[in-house]
């Protein structure tokens, strides 16, 4: 029925009309066909909320007051919840707001692997682990698409650096692609049923991703049976014939000469001249029409399409829920947290990030937030009343051009470099101003009962188009933290950032709380956790290393090169490498503390048959032995006995459970054959491997609480 309807429309379209549907006719829209009631496709950036309205043919915010929206926590924050239900809730907010703003496609979520902590867009991505990405991207897509909006999962594939992203050739072996870089996208297609997917800027093994037959035609269309729409990243197409023959459906660009795009007039001419088959154009239009039909943009269900809503109270509650579970208590010696802010006490909040807002920066992730509660606002709002809260910036941020004024997309095809320059502030050197700010902060700290430092990064560093030079904290923050810890040893250090940073003071700090960019209610959530109103339950979705020299992308492979980047580390990405090499990292993958305590007991591992296939049932008991209700994420790792050239273990399942004080619950997961498989380059598929496996259950990749062995034999092994 659906395909018949599509074919009937296709017969009515002229070649010119079909060409008009497969390239941009505005910066964020395509051309419709009014005579056949085919509307344009309206798209929006959206990793952290629906982006502001842009002019059709100019990279300029149109200046309306109707595009203020809910500001969601970034994908790194969502991943840190380890909560599938919250990932879906975030998707629901994004999808409903996109519809409310009249959008058909939201360009989200981003799921590229966090290969290096220096990638400028890591805050837009979820994790270093493909399995965790799979588990969270599927419900997020479902949440978006329940609102008759297409999710557009990006960037396919291996877009793990910003340096020379348009032209860098990413060299990755087949096994690493299949086991690390493809699984998130495959799950998005096969399980999440994403209606759209964005091709990446970079080349992959010599082919531009948006014009790659092996990537789009073979892997995506043939192997994964994707029948949705492939959209190019803006300006990622470079050849008419290659684009026409690949599985790309829609070319978008940063330039305003829409008819000059490769899949516009040049393609029209090539088809008319007999150089390119019109059937290739038909297939692209067919995919677009299919998506439109599923979105109720056309067809008999058109009048039943959801209308959406934005800036609702329900959305604000949802993003607060996500923010609360995203924050990670990295360290808490001597029970410094939660704070005991008694009546009449003096609280010092120090650090420029305490008063900063982040919604208006980062590149295509920027939005016009209806509001944003900063950490300082959140602390003042919660403590208020009889507690005196004072603020000092502690360090100075040099003036830079407002992020909202920077034309990120228009500059996306240019090479940018991250450089540091000397600055002056009010006629004095930056160093002089920094020393004044430091002295003011230390004096305030000494005069206070409680000291909270809020530092980290901002979108000068976590930003599209640039990779960081190193993991160091900017603006002399290490000096500020050292001075505060010396003056007040119980100073609570809060980091607000989009990617890991060096923490040379970590051994001295008693309490460290980490927050990714946590959305419009981030400051509220931070204050609730500091005060104990909310018990932290976030876990790291990436390893926090001490500095970039520990990262295999830098020591074994290459990162940040401008022409060719070699992923020589293969599957040894993130904790797979660090745990195998017993690297002394700062905080391991999966780590995150609570104000209560949990114990694991009674591990049971049972081999069983399901639908003719062998599975392994893993169960254990988890008890809250502390005095507060809390949530724990139970992580299950599989460790093969034969480890040659393989990670020592890999995450294969997890469950997040809420427990009242003294409560015990039984956790049960089913491991399937794929969880004991390796990619076979001869058979071109994952193959289960016979042998002895250790099943590890724990609170992080290095905090293994229970383990047991099982011998497995697979018919295909």
Labelled PLM ranges:
Residues 1-681, 685-702, 709, 714-717:
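Glycoside hydrolase catalytic-domain context in secreted enzymes
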